[in-house]
């Protein structure tokens, strides 16, 4: 796995680990599990820490030849947003949020819910293949 540089002398991977640990509840555990699945699906994934603003500490991002997905936590949900999710086949129907747009798709996970690891890794691999191909238009086959 590769890392991009980050701020305050910490690597992006260190910032991601720290932010997940600081959550201290099911959200951090869920994001840590999904992070592990991302790394299993693509050992060459690049972890980044982006969009740091005064009102936001930043967002964990996973990339490979372009953005794959972001991981965010809110009070009652963990959200994984795939930047080109509308172009990915999702036979397991993991995408359950941001379904109306032409580009992004997201997976919202609530406390107690589990994500099918095999199906999730398949989405990661598809996203990497799509980024590597240079294609950005949604395929008609991927829509459901």
PLM region descriptions:
Residues 1-144:
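Charge-dense, helix-prone N-terminal extensions
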